């Protein structure tokens, strides 16, 4: 999945800093938002990050030096399709339902990207966490809940 992905959406979770750094080193194009989606979507192309600055760029304060704000229309034109999406989670059921993080921002991000045709059923969704965060509990699933694939 990751190896073949050219464009990856990575949520601004602190636990995903190393993933962002690795993606920049691996020359992946990264799409992200800020916390709360208050400033919309941002595109970070690998060539915009000077060699050796990948770690700084992976931090929320650092990435703002290299990202380019994108409307959804611009994002569709710039990247076309997002191959992989990665989000953090407080907990995940074995069936891929995230819970405990609150606010539903990832569900909203997915819905906006899906409506624009930037993500679809072939876009892989990964929940990043530790094995101890997988909880076999009954969770009420809402129609707008976006399940993870892995």
Language-model region placement:
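N-terminal targeting/leader regions
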Residues: 1-10, 17-19
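General beta-strand structural signal in soluble alpha/beta enzymes
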Residues: 10, 32-33
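A short acidic, amphipathic alpha-helical/loop segment
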Residues: 18-23, 140
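Alpha-helix N-cap/helix-start and coil->helix boundary motif
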Residues: 16-17, 106
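N-terminal functional module of multi-domain proteins
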Residues: 18, 33-35
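Surface-exposed, charge/polar-rich loops and edge strands
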Residues: 1-6, 26-29, 37-150
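Small/polar loops that bind or transfer phosphate-bearing groups
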Residues: 11-12, 101
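Short beta->alpha connector loops
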Residues: 12-16, 132-133
